[in-house]
Amino acid sequence: RGQRGRTWQGATGLDLMASIVLLPERMRAVAQFTLAKAAALAVRDLVADVFRSEDLDVARIRIKGPNDILVDRHKLAGILIANEIKGEHVRSSIVGIGINVNSSTWEGVDATSLLLETRRGQDLHLLLSRLCMHMDHWWGLTGKDDAAIAAAYTDALWAKDRYTDFTLDGRRITARPLDVDDMGRLIIEEVGGEVAAYGLERLRFLM
């Protein structure tokens, strides 16, 4: 379970579900979304590894802000993060990661899995090892090169700079994602040129 009561549903023994505990040394609370970016990029890189091994197009793998991983328009992975804040700093962070690996059916969810994309089953232990490797890479950049993390995350955003449909406070709009701000809100530009940042409680993709 993550922030705002969000949960991940996965099939035991078929899908990869992992919790990674991080203990930042000097991360300020205002910069905590960098952790979410690092985790999303680690999962994106893991999925890209699998795609490359099967000669599939890695450009189909995108991040739907703040931290879902899509293949085309179908959800393949999600990340749930719970941070413990003490004063002005992040004391600890639990990063929950769920990846659809060997599942093939879901109820009420537009999803996909590595099995469906590659037409072959995947070894969960091997995937976990590679996930930790990629997480170690991006986590190692936090506080040292946050700009590189931000640039990679922005570049991987789903529908970036492309007009698509959203609902804003229940009202349908057409806008294009530009970036995310330090609070994890998606920055969009509406057709009329208005630029603003919104959180998930107000802004929803229409998939």
Where are these regions (language model features)?
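Short, acidic Gly/Pro/Ser/Thr-rich loop/turn segments
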Residues: 1, 25, 101-104, 185
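Contiguous, small/hydrophobic- and glycine-enriched helical/loop subdomains that border
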Residues: 1-90, 121-133, 137-144
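Detector for glycine-centered tight turns/loop "hinges" at secondary-structure junctions
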Residues: 2-5, 73, 119, 170, ...
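A secondary-structure boundary/capping signal
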Residues: 65-66, 97, 199
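Conserved beta-strand residues within beta-sheet cores
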Residues: 66, 73-78, 150, 161-163, ...
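Short, acidic (Asp/Glu-rich) active-site segment that either coordinates a divalent metal cofactor
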Residues: 88-118
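Polybasic "coupling" helices that flank or enter modular domains
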Residues: 131, 139-167
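Conserved RNA-binding domains used in RNP assembly and mRNA/RNA metabolism
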Residues: 160-207
